[in-house]
Amino acid sequence: MHSANIREEEEKYYLSRAKQQNQQLIVPPLNFSMIAPGIYRSGFPNPKSHPFLLQLKLRTIIYVFDGDCQPYHQEFIQNNSINYKHFRVAANKEPFEEMDHGLVAEILAEVLDTRNHPLLLHCNRGIRRVGSLVGCIRKLQGWAMTAIFDEYQRFSGTKIRISDQEFIEVFRHPVYIDPQFKPPWLDIE
């Protein structure tokens, strides 16, 4: 028997076993990754990714985008008693549009509050807005700017926006984090 035929037979076998055991394929949302223990990032979750999200036992979902949430996602959030926060955040675009520094500080305070963990932070594609916010978290963690930009570029691929990187670099707005609910991996006062 040829190796291609063997692989096809194995695939058929495992698919039939999964059906027999009533298992679903687990599909993470676009650009999903862990930022830090209890904090995840992604693009907009679709219904196929909901079983994956259930495994995370999310307490909070934060959506950062200037548009509305999809009804199927709102239903998922309500049906699973997940705390939902929607911040209408504009994208960083040259030459005059920039994320609001005060709003970013407010979002970071929510993301870093352990009472909200486990938490998913997402925008539509999980690239620009979330990438900028993650870059600001990395600054708070004391990462080097080159490491921050490297992480940003891993998620943005060819869609790098210099304005996002500039925003991360100049962000200095104070972020209030209650010391009682600060994550143990964040070493700031």
What kind of feature is each model-predicted range?
Residues 1-121, 125, 132-189:
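Cys-dependent protein tyrosine phosphatase-like superfamily
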